[in-house]
């Protein structure tokens, strides 16, 4: 997935989404083989080199990885994928806790990268497929409620150019935030 000595889990998550789209368009079974092999590699290596080992991106965006693991599980039924999903979730930013206000990021200016927040909206709902906890399923809706009072904008997005900041009508939000939020929805 990466050339040379560049090691990071996050770019591989992007490649997994591309492989999924390719499979959905073509039905090419090689994708299933490649993803299965990669996920076995992840299961073997994540305990020693967690999602935040090389950069923080993997930890914040682990929901994208989890999404691809569950997608493959729904095709193959391979039990090791559920174990991997549990591991990925445990190494991912605790979005459900954040979205229920158990931490202060949603009430603190400059507390996180705005695009990471957009990525995070999908993780509790993806995890809900395994947890079946209504708190996970309802976490994104609760986050939006909190954010309307802090850095939310009338557009439904939130204020942020790199870092989130309190809503100011003269400042907008990144295009990448809008794109990732659409993907999360």
Tell where the protein language model's regions lie, with residue ranges:
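Glycan-recognition and catalytic cores of secretory/periplasmic carbohydrate-active enzymes
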Residues: 1-185
